[in-house]
Each structure stands twice: as C-alpha cells, then as structure tokens.
C-alpha cells in the first residue's frame, strides 16, 4: 500500500516531465511508465541524501581525541554547544553555471553576510541616512546654543538635523552602470511638538532636496572607473565634525562632474556647478538674480609616506551678468559682484592603532574669505543664505586647521579640532567693509573607554576673535565651554562611528560679546544645561 501511494505521489510530481515527453509516453505501457517514474524517484532521493550527508558532516563536531575544557569559573565547558538559537554560518545557493555538475556539486556555500550583500546588490537599492535628536533643559529656561562652530557641539546643540539618501541602480551591464540618487535634508524642531513643515515657528522646521542626480560608470573611455554625474549635486564636502562646519563645500543647484578619476598616483574630482544669488541694493529692499558658476578641482589621495595622503584643491566662482544687472550695480546702488576663489591643501595621516589626523591650509579672497571670519559657522560659502550684500575689495584670508582622534593606550581616546584664521581688508557682517580679523578656536575631547559600548569624558572648548573695522576700532568675542558626558556607542571611535547616545552636563560662558551682543535667557552671560542626545547614521 505504501509503495502504491509513493508511486502515485511521484506521478503527480513528475507530471510536467510526462507532459513534455508526451509523444514518447504514448508508446509506453502503464507498467513501463511506472518503472521510469520509480527510477527517477530513486535518483532524486539519492541526490537529496547525498547533500544531507554532506551538510551533516559540515556541522557534526569531531569526537576523536577530544579533551574537556573548563571555563573561567572552573566548570567544564559544553563540548557540543547548542546551535539552534544561533544564526547559521552559511547558506547553500544553487550554481547556475552549465558545468557546475561536472565540478562535483550544483550547490556552493555562502555566508549570511555575503548572501545579504548579494541580495542588496541584486536589487540595486540602498537607503542611507543621518539624524540627531534629543532632550535638554537649562538653568535659565529654554537652553540656547552659542558659537557651536568655535566651542564644539557636545551639550551645545539643540537641533534635529537629518539627511536621507535614496539610491537606485537602473542599469549594470557590459561594464556600464547607472544610478539615480536623491538626497533629502532639513531640520525638525526640538522645541514645539507641532513640527509641521511650513508652520515654521522659530524657523526650525524645513526640508529640501539637496541632491537629485544621475551618476554613471564606464561611459567615459578615458576614465572608465570614475563616477560621472549630472544633476543637482556638488563636489564632496569635508567637515570639521566637532565644530559642525566644512572646510570644503561647494553648494550647487545643478551641475556636471567627475569623481575618483585615477590620474597618476592620485585621483581627480572636478565639478562645474551653478548657484544663482540674490544681489541686493544698499537699502536691502530690492534685489536682482545673478547667474553664477563655480569650477571646483581637487587632486586627492596622493600617497606621501606610510598611511599619509595629500590633497590639493582649487575653486573659482564667477558671474554671468546681463547688461541690466551691471547697470543696476553701476547706477542704482546694487552691490557689485566680485569673483572669488579659494586654494589650499590638506594632509591626512592615519595611525597604526587606529585614528587619524587631518591638517589643512586654505587661502581665499572676497566673499569666501569673509566666511573664514565667522566664529559661529565658517563654511566657505559665497553668500549668506543665497543673499549677496557686501562691498568686496580683493581682501584675503588664511585658515589653518587640525582635526582628528588618537588612541592612548587601551582605554583612552582624544579627539581634537583646532583652527587659526586671519584676514585683511575683508567684508564682515559685524564690522563692515575693510575689516581685519584674527581668531583661534580649540576643542579637545578626551574620554575613558570602558568597553566597546561605553565611554566617559569631557569636551573642553575655547575661542577668541578680534575684528578691527575701517576706523581701527576693535571688537572682541570670546568664550568657553565645559561638557561632561557619558556615551553609549557601538564602536570606540569618536569621529567615525555611530550610533552614539550622549548624556551630558554643560557649562558655557560668554566672556566677551562685542560682535553679536549675544545673551542667554534673562540676559545672562552663562548657562548650565543637562540633556540627552542621540546621533545615528546608517
């Protein structure tokens, strides 16, 4: 009876084969058909048993010459630990090569990590992002941030910034690849529970499409390995992470560029981008749109010595002005556009025990130089939020920076951000045209590493800046910050790993405020704050 049921099941399973060989089957008797099906079933069972036996051998522990080990407490360790709750080390995948059976197996082993990567690569879609959010309160009411770009971020940051990137591969054949990339970024308010975009109380809630471009590989015969892109995108940004501003930043509404083009010992990044600006008159009541374009060129990853690389960079911004726009500048009180440039170099040294340090030297003129003189955020913009209202006379500014982290022994790590800047005959938003400035800002963050997941430390920040206006009047701004913190982490690096959950207590004091007149709540010059903040990227 069992044999008849088995044969009947085999008939149902092999029906498609029988249908495809209908002409042959019509010439066979019922007994011959059953005999063929039994043979096929035996072969299938044999093949299945073969692979079951192979897998059993892989996961069956050897028993020859086994000695009993003990754990740290002196108890005998289990020589056959239970594996039912653990993830398998590998999965079997079927080979699609025609000669797979000739090599002995139509299956091969693949780790779960590799299998997951294979699935992602096959789908061609990735979702990456970043955001920060947290709770805080202060000694004089609502907590306020001050001079983050000079005193550091820990315990001085009350924003909910986010970046969300979507990337979809749309073609990957014959050595050519095409990806569509969209980046959304913005801020979610951390003060009011109603955080609707558009209902922007306090200017907190906003969002934009900062990237929307197509990137390709393999289409340029002279640079098949490079990333060639077209759309709303800019050259790569380089950030002073502890101060939350960039040493390299080229904003763009749209452009065309090439990244990671191998030339000689290094790689070239080049971008040509557009960024129109609103040029104001001196009453700041009227404006006109000026079409500007930027060429950004970098030669990077130049090897110097062991674990050291060099980058040389240059950037030039010019305007494509109409006759009427020039006439408004000459006769109707609009600010004259002045081309601006920035050149520099940076050296990155990686350390044997982990960590790195990056040193950079930058020099700029006109509107980019003006932003070197900002103590709060000093990214090299050409405008202030797209607005151009300043008299430039060819003045220059210089900036030297150091940032990085280093491990000291097995249980200590120190991060740093140090910036020295000075400029002559620049425009300052605080002291006007023909201003000079000099500033130094330093933040250090030592911490004790308890384990991979816990650190306790302090962030110390200090800055001082002096501006001198056209009449040689001097204006000083300075302050310091001390933040005690404990962090939950997933790795020991301060600057290159996230998740990070911080619990902090911060004391911040404005020593001089002659440039911005800033005060905390109740017109105080200091603030004590406590809070918790989560920061994550993926």
From Swiss-Prot:
Q: Which domain of life is it from?
A: Bacteria
Where does this one sit in the cell?
A: Cell outer membrane
For this protein, the record's InterPro entries field holds: G_neg_Bact_CarbUptk_Porin, LamB-type_porin_N_dom, Porin_LamB, Porin_LamB_sf
Q: Which molecular-function annotation in GO is an example for this chain?
A: porin activity
Q: Which residues form a coiled coil?
A: none
**Sequence ranges of Polar residues compositional bias:** 62-73
Tell me if Transmembrane is a UniProt keyword of this record.
yes
Please state the span of the N-terminal signal peptide per the UniProt entry. Answer: 1-25
Name a single GO biological process: polysaccharide transport
Query: Which residue ranges does the record annotate as region Disordered?
Result: 52-82
Q: Does the keyword Transcription apply?
A: no
GO cellular component, as recorded: cell outer membrane; pore complex
Q: How does it sit in the membrane?
A: Multi-pass membrane protein
Record keywords: Cell outer membrane, Ion transport, Membrane, Porin, Signal, Transmembrane, Transmembrane beta strand, Transport
- Major subcellular location class: membrane
PANTHER family assigned to the protein according to its UniProt record, in alphabetical order:
CRYPTIC OUTER MEMBRANE PORIN BGLH-RELATED
Functionally, this protein is described as follows:
May be a sugar porin with a broad carbohydrate specificity.
Return the similarity comment: Belongs to the porin LamB (TC 1.B.3) family.
Q: What is this protein called?
A: Putative outer membrane porin BglH
Q: Which gene encodes it?
A: bglH
């Amino acid at each position: 009876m069992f044999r008849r049921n088995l044969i009947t099941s085999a008939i149902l399973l092999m029906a498609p084969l029988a249908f495809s060989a209908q002409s042959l089957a019509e010439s066979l008797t019922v007994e011959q058909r059953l005999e063929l099906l039994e043979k096929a079933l035996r072969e299938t069972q044999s093949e299945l048993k073969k692979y079951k036996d192979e897998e059993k051998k892989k996961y069956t522990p050897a028993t020859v010459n086994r000695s009993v080990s003990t754990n740290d407490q002196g108890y005998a360790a289990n020589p056959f630990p239970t594996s039912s709750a653990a993830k398998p080390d590998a999965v079997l995948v079927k080979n699609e090569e025609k000669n797979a059976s000739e090599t002995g197996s139509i299956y091969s082993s693949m780790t779960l990590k590799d299998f997951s990567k294979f699935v992602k690569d096959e789908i061609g879609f990735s979702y990456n992002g970043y955001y920060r959010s947290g709770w805080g309160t202060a000694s004089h009411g609502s907590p306020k941030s001050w001079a983050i770009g000079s005193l550091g971020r820990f315990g001085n940051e009350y924003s909910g910034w986010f970046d969300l990137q979507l990337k979809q591969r749309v073609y990957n054949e014959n050595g050519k690849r095409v990806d569509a990339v969209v980046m959304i970024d913005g801020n979610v308010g951390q003060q009011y529970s109603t955080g609707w975009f558009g209902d922007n109380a306090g200017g907190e809630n906003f969002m934009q499409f900062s990237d929307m471009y197509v990137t390709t590989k393999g289409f340029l015969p002279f640079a098949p390995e490079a990333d060639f892109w077209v759309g709303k995108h800019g050259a790569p940004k380089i950030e002073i992470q502890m101060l939350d501003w960039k040493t390299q930043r080229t904003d763009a509404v749209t452009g065309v560029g090439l990244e990671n083009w191998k030339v000689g010992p290094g790689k070239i990044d080049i971008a040509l981008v557009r960024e129109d600006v609103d040029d104001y008159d001196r009453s700041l009541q009227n404006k006109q749109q000026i079409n500007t374009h930027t060429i950004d060129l970098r030669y990077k990853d130049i090897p110097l010595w062991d674990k050291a690389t060099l980058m040389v960079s240059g950037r030039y911004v010019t305007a494509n002005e109409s006759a009427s726009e020039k006439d408004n500048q000459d006769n109707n009180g609009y600010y004259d556009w002045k081309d601006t440039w920035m050149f520099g170099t940076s050296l990155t040294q990686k350390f044997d025990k982990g960590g790195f340090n990056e040193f950079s030297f930058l020099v700029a003129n006109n509107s980019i130089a003006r932003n070197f003189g900002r103590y709060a955020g000093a990214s090299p913009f050409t405008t202030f939020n797209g607005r151009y209202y300043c008299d430039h006379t060819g003045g220059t500014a210089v900036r030297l920076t150091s940032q990085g982290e280093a491990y000291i022994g097995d249980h200590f790590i120190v991060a740093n951000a140090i910036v020295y800047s000075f400029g002559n005959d620049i425009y300052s938003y605080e002291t006007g045209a023909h201003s000079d400035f000099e500033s130094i800002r330093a933040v250090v963050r030592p911490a004790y590493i308890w384990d991979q997941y816990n650190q306790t430390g302090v962030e110390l920040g200090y800055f001082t800046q002096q501006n001198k206006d056209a009449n040689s009047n001097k204006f000083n701004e300075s302050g310091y910050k001390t933040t005690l913190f404990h962090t939950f982490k997933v790795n020991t690096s301060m600057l290159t790993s996230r998740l990070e959950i911080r619990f902090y207590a911060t004391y911040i004091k404005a020593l001089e405020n002659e440039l911005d007149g800033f005060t905390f709540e109740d017109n105080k010059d200091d603030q004590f704050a406590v809070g918790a903040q989560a920061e994550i990227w993926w």
